Each structure stands twice: as C-alpha cells, then as structure tokens.
C-alpha cells in the first residue's frame, strides 16, 4: 500500500498536527500592502479580528498565495516518509493556489521520479474542505487507488453548498472575491448581504434584514439546487462574532430544520475561521456549509 501524504492549505479549518498524515500550507495575510504574515503561524484570527474592529470603514489588508518556499520545506521534511502526495487546495475560483501547486508538483515530479504527485481542484473552502480532506484520508488509509480518490473529489464537489451572511460588503469589495457587486447597493445599514459559494465561486445571492431571514434564504438555495427531497449529511457553522450571537444563530438553524422537517439527523459542526477568511468576510459574519447525502 502506498504511503500517502495529504497537503491542504490554511483555509481548510484544520490545525497543524490535527490529522495524522495531513499537512497545512499557510496562505499569507498582507497588512498595509507590505507586511506579510503566514496564516496560522505568524498571524491568527484574533489578531485580524482586532484590526478589523479597530477599522470599521475598511482596512488595508489582503491575502496572497502561499510561499513556494513553505511548500518545498514541507516536502523536504516529509519526502522520505511517503510515496504519494495528494494536494487539496481551496477553490481555484477564489485563489491562484491551485495553479501554483500544479506547477510546483510538476517540477517536484521531474526531480523525484519515484514519487507520485496529484493536485485536485476542490471547488471548496473552510469546513467543507476539511470534510473532503477527512474523506480522502479515509480512502488513503484503506489503500484506495487514484481513480477512486478522484471520483470522491468529483462527487464531493457536486454535493456541497455554502453561504456566508455578512454584516456589510466593506472587506469583500476590497478583496474582489465576488461577482455581481455592481447590482447591489446597501442603502440601509441593517441590510445583510448573503454570499452564495457554489461550484467554486462566490456570487451575491440575496439581501436580508435578519438572521432568521438569512437562514431561510440559505435553505432556499439548497432546495433550488438539490430539489425537495434532499438529505443532509453534514452541516458546518462558522462565525466571526461573539459566542452569544453564535448560539442564537445556531438555534435559529436548528429550529428551522425541525420546523420544516428537513432530513438531517446529526449535530451541527462548529469550525474556526482562519485569518485569511476573515480578511474577506469581515467581522460579524457567519457561514453555513452543507454536504448532501446522495446515496
């Protein structure tokens, strides 16, 4: 059986060392256009949250690709332990990380003929990317071949949907990670935009005035994509505000599921937001990610 390492990036809501055989490549946070910090290593969620809170009208902060040197360092440290290296980066619709890894994997393959390198386009991010990593890890541990792993990635992409409800579009506009902003003008401060993340890209889905309206809209997106009789396998909940608000919204989600008799039998999973992600969402935002059971 091939000894396999999985390499994902720091947007996947996985902490270094959390999953055996899974390695985290940090993206970068750029402050004031010049100071670069590696996500989860030199800067964290709390630091970025503080900066954003101190600058409510917008902050000169952005994100950037991982450093090539960080990937090469990871590879040098683990190359003698593994025969196969599987890369599961965030969606190429959000970042150039995938393209960078494709090129680096090609170079590494030419230099290491006895190793195998596979880079997959996940169309994913955050907690649902973590789910994919966990599923691929389970297949790897069973000794599954490349075709089985590829099929799982493709199946996962077809059965996920995420939506982010924002306080405003200040940071999202700065990041340029969304289409359709020209059609959206927030004339009322209480309007909360919902960003739909589907098929690897962000689009402006709707605008609402309350958390309960946001939850209703998000499950409406799910119904539109998957039909009336969908069954939810996993629900992930991420947030960038205080715990009291988080508990309030989580209860709204749970009550909505129960009231509408939605087919979901498990617990809603919480996940931390990395500094790279909060740079774009800003504070007082939350996301709901869903994995549909297609069996």
Curated annotation (Swiss-Prot):
Keywords: Lipid-binding. Residues 4-292 form the DegV domain. Hexadecanoate binds at residues 63, 95. One of its GO terms (molecular function) is lipid binding. InterPro entries: DegV, DegV_C, DegV_domain_contain. Pfam families: DegV. NCBIfam families: DegV. This is DegV domain-containing protein MG326. It comes from Mycoplasma genitalium (strain ATCC 33530 / DSM 19775 / NCTC 10195 / G37) (Mycoplasmoides genitalium).
